[in-house]
Every structure is written in structure tokens, then in C-alpha cells.
């Protein structure tokens, strides 16, 4: 039997998936350092909550496992992250079997890093892997076939080989190899969205911190906006502000001025702001996922 299936899965209790709301107080904007005199975000508690939510959503579905290539879903289930460059490569993935622990395939050095620094994951469940890199690696090399057969073997050992697996996003050649390995593919994104829909108190605290950072960014814009400043100048200032305050993904800063405001182009240029211009800004960023 595969080593991954020998050890008992981590048991998530009802208390683990208690969101711990306290609506009798205002939502806190917590500091980001760990301190001994205040309870702040408990990241291990948040991991167990998220894993429990995903497991419960999986149990409520007709799926035998979830196969996740979406970076947001991978982070939700495993509490792991590498650089933003990997977000669109579709070459890290997680398999969550019904009643089991998440198994993560990542770039080789990242997998070793997870074994050292992510003790909430079983070391043997942090595996090196590579598939298509969005077509960069030709399927003829056999990497997709290898990993599809590997996952089929794991699901057989987990007792769910005949049940469909839910996938969030996937390269077509990888899906074809999974089907050749005898697996039935269904939509798993809706199952994950149902799991992620209800936020815990820890997640809400992080959302509030992210919003506070954006509040500060808008105040910076208010201070810096004047004739002669270019749209891209504002974008650079806001990116610096957010990353200095701990943002892990500034997805976009829309900075639009003057005649560019209508119709909305959804990007920024080097246009210089002039007196009396209408201006529009939109900030998309995340803090701790």
C-alpha cells in the first residue's frame, strides 16, 4: 500500500470548523506581528478550519476526491504558497481524497521546503511534481501520464477509485490522461466555493486588515494626486505602500484619468493628470491569501 495511505488522516473536529464569531464587538484590525499579550490571527486554527470546511463540502458531494490546480484552492487546503509567478502555470496541485489528508505536488525545492517548514502537512504528502506548465512541457514526455497513474493508484488505495473526482481548473491534456487512467472528471470548483463561502473569525480579521491597507493606499493617493503626476506614478506608489505593509499579491491598480475614464479601459498608462480631471482608482490586493 502507498505510504501516503498507511497513516491515519488528521481528524478535524466540530470545534475546528466553529467560525468563532463575536458579533458583540467591532471587527478588529489586528497587528501583524505575533505577540504574547493579545490573541491575534491563529494561522494553525485557520488551517484546520479551512481543511475541515473542504472535507465537509467533499463529504456532502458525490465526489471521491478534489483535485485542485487553482492556487487559491491549494492555499486554502494546504496553507502553502510560493511566488506569484506560479499562479498561472497549472503545475502545482493538491489531491484531497474523501476522508483523507491533502497531498501536495510542488516544484522540487518547494516540496522540500514544505517538509521543513509546514509541519501541519505530513512530510510524505509533500511531493515533487511537474506536469505541463501550460503547454511548455509536451505531453509526449509522459509527465502527465505518470502523475495521472500515480493519483489513480492513490485513490484506489483510499477506497474511492470508482467515484468521480472534482477538478477546479486543468489543462486539457492532463484531463485526458486522468480519464485514460480510469478516473471520471466532474466540476469541483463549486464544491470548493461552497467550502470557502463561510469565513472564520480569523479569515474575517485578515480581510479587515487587507481593507485597512487599501484605506491607507487611498489616503496616499489623495495626498499625492496633483497636476503633473502620471497614472503610472500613482500605481508605483500604491504598489510600494501595499508590499511594504505585507501584501502578498497586488493583483492590479487601475489608475485612470481625464478622457480615459469613459469608457473604462481597466488599465493604466503614463497619462499625466491635468487640473480639473476626473480620476478613477481601483485597488485589488490580498493579505495572507
Residue ranges and their predicted role:
Residues 164-167, 221-230:
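Conserved short loop/turn motifs at secondary-structure junctions
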Residues 211-218, 231, 239:
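Active-site pocket-lining segments that scaffold enzyme catalytic pockets across diverse folds
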Residues 43-46, 226-234:
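Signal-transducing coiled-coil linker helices
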Residues 74-86, 187-201, 229-289:
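Short catalytic-site patches enriched in acidic/histidine residues
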Residues 1-213:
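A composition/biophysics-driven feature that prefers long, compositionally simple stretches
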Residues 58, 225, 242:
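Hydrophobic pocket-lining residues that define ligand/cofactor binding sites across diverse proteins
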Residues 43, 116-131, 218-222, 243-249, ...:
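A short, terminal or domain-edge coil/loop segment
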Amino acid at each position: 500500500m502507498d505510504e501516503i495511505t498507511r497513516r491515519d488522516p488528521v481528524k478535524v473536529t466540530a470545534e475546528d470548523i466553529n467560525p468563532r464569531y463575536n458579533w458583540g464587538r467591532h471587527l478588529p484590525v489586528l497587528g501583524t506581528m505575533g505577540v504574547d499579550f493579545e490573541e491575534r490571527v491563529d494561522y494553525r486554527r485557520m488551517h484546520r478550519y479551512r481543511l475541515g470546511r473542504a472535507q465537509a463540502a467533499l463529504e456532502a458531494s458525490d465526489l471521491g476526491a478534489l483535485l485542485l490546480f487553482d492556487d487559491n484552492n491549494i492555499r486554502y487546503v494546504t496553507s502553502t504558497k510560493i511566488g506569484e509567478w506560479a499562479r498561472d502555470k497549472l503545475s502545482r496541485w493538491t489531491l484531497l481524497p474523501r476522508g483523507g489528508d491533502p497531498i501536495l505536488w510542488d516544484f522540487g525545492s518547494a516540496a522540500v521546503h514544505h517538509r521543513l517548514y509546514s509541519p501541519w502537512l505530513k512530510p510524505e504528502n509533500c511531493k515533487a511534481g511537474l506536469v505541463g506548465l501550460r503547454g511548455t512541457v509536451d505531453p509526449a514526455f509522459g509527465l502527465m501520464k505518470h502523475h495521472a497513474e500515480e493519483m489513480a493508484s492513490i485513490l484506489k488505495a483510499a477506497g474511492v477509485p470508482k467515484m468521480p473526482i472534482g477538478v477546479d481548473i486543468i489543462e486539457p491534456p492532463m484531463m485526458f490522461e486522468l480519464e485514460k487512467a480510469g478516473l471520471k472528471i466532474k466540476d469541483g470548483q463549486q464544491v470548493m466555493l461552497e467550502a470557502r463561502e463561510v469565513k472564520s473569525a480569523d479569515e474575517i480579521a485578515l480581510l479587515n486588515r487587507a481593507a485597512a491597507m487599501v484605506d491607507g493606499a487611498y489616503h496616499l493617493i489623495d495626498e499625492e494626486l496633483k497636476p503633473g503626476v502620471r497614472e503610472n506614478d500613482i500605481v508605483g506608489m500604491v504598489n510600494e505602500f501595499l508590499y511594504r505593509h505585507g501584501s502578498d499579491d497586488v493583483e492590479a491598480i487601475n489608475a485612470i484619468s481625464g478622457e480615459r475614464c469613459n469608457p473604462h479601459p481597466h488599465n493604466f498608462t503614463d497619462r499625466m493628470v491635468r487640473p480639473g480631471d476626473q480620476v478613477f482608482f481601483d485597488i485589488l490586493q490580498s493579505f495572507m491569501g
